[in-house]
Amino acid sequence: VHQEAIVPGTVYVAPGNYHMAIEHNTIQLSQTEKLNGVRPAVDVLFESAAKKYTSDLLAIVMTGMGKDGTVGMTHVKATGGVTIVQDEETSVVYGMPGNAVKAGVVDAIYDLDDIAKLLHDIER
């Protein structure tokens, strides 16, 4: 996946122990320092995606421990993108979504089924 060209409509998943970023319409993997105590960290991806896609970006944080995603969502909001988190009721762990909500960087809160529907509708 490293340096692979980004293809619209494709889902990319960061491999374990690698940060994923977007640079010049390609996937960039790195083993740079852990961020928020983790690698991969979604903050790395969101920050790079915000620079590339600005207001065309939709960032979603779903269930997870810690605060990863909050700083990245701040960048997404600053460049005009849209931010969504999974609701507390359908999250196994509400750490990541909850921290983003507390930081005030979330446009909408959806349950898991509504996130799936949204992604399905966007793909069409």
Would you name each region that the model predicts?
Residues 1-124:
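Conserved acid/base catalytic micro-environments in cytosolic active-site loops
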